[in-house]
């Protein structure tokens, strides 16, 4: 029997952000304001709030912004020496650490309403399915290249991923939100995804991947679909009855139905849109004036220390 989810989880591995990913935002101020809005909106619906981060993340989000997470873990200190191009490691470690049903939110996701019961009661859930074309060099997902790069150098891939690619499956799952009630399956998925990144046999192969930061989406989102559909196809698998529910049925619905559902995700270029940045700033200044001022004070403090 499933439980009603009370736990909202965020993760922040500071190393990839410091190296590259901060450039994804209109400004550092708007990145921080997004954290404020994501946290404050979600905790109205999911009161047990958890942050999985490292020491630098604590200094920024807890000491700096004053976000009042119920639980803070510095589990991601374990990634200090890891390759920051595999930015998704922070999320995968956070998924693996959970010991009760949860929803993990990216910090650019804002929940204006509770997630529907059909979603939060599911064994596993994600934001929406994504599809791509095999052989498209501009696609976010290039599983045939990923497999060839690893297998040609005697690397290691889990059975789920090898099978899914061999079947030419072209479905992934967007993980702007991710979570569920079947923790055994989620732990298996997250731990196996981490093994793909950390397996000693893959170290040589990864030197030949041209964009590991993009392949991170494959390891998280394509492999999630691979895990679901592989085990559904194996009658003897303990996970054969695990299904996944998506908040939106299609990528397009995530835009056209977002207001109705009460969900905002600042995907991709939206983070650098000046009009959206202005709306974000005005919303936080209006709804959370103390947090807004705390953000400005923190930015001043960082600037003075530079």
Language-model regions, residue ranges each:
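Glycogenin-like
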Residues: 111-232
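A conserved donor-nucleotide-binding helix/loop in the catalytic core
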Residues: 30-32, 37-38, 76-105, 109-112
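A glycosyltransferase accessory/donor-loop signature
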Residues: 1-5, 11-12, 165-169, 187-306
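N-terminal anchoring/stem segment of glycosyltransferases
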Residues: 1-79, 215, 267-305
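Short, polar loop motifs at secondary-structure junctions
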Residues: 53-59, 107-113, 242-244
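Active-site regions of enzymes building and remodeling cell-envelope glycoconjugates
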Residues: 64-78, 101-102, 118-127, 261-264
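Short, hydrophobic beta-strand segments that form beta-sheet elements in well-ordered domains
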Residues: 48-55, 101-106, 126
């Amino acid at each position: 029997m499933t439980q009603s989810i009370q736990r909202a989880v965020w993760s922040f591995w500071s190393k990839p952000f410091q190296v590259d990913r901060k450039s994804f935002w209109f400004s550092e101020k708007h990145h921080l304001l997004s954290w404020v809005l994501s946290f404050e909106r979600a905790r109205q619906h999911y009161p047990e709030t958890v942050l999985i981060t490292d020491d630098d993340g604590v200094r920024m989000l807890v000491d700096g912004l004053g976000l009042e997470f119920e639980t803070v873990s510095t589990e991601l200190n374990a990634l200090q020496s890891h390759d920051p191009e595999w930015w998704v490691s922070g999320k995968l470690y956070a998924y693996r650490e959970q010991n009760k049903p949860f929803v993990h939110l990216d910090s650019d996701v804002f929940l204006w309403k509770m997630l529907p019961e059909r979603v939060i009661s599911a064994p596993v859930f994600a934001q929406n399915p994504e599809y791509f074309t095999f052989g498209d060099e501009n696609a976010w997902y290039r599983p045939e290249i990923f497999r060839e790069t690893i297998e040609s150098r005697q690397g290691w891939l889990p059975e789920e991923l090898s099978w899914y690619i061999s079947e030419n499956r072209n479905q992934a799952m967007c993980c702007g939100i991710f979570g569920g009630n079947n923790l055994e399956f989620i732990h298996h998925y997250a731990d196996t995804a981490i093994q793909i990144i950390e397996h000693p046999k893959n170290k040589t192969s990864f030197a030949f991947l041209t964009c590991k930061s993009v392949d991170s989406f494959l390891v998280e989102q394509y492999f999630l679909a691979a895990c679901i559909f592989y085990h559904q196809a194996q009658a003897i698998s303990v996970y054969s009855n695990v299904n996944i529910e998506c908040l939106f049925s299609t990528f397009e619905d995530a835009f056209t139905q977002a207001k109705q559902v009460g969900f905002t995700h600042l995907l991709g270029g939206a983070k650098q849109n000046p009009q959206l940045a202005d709306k974000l700033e005005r919303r936080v200044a209006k709804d959370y004036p103390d947090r807004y001022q705390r953000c400005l004070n923190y930015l001043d403090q960082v600037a003075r220390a530079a």
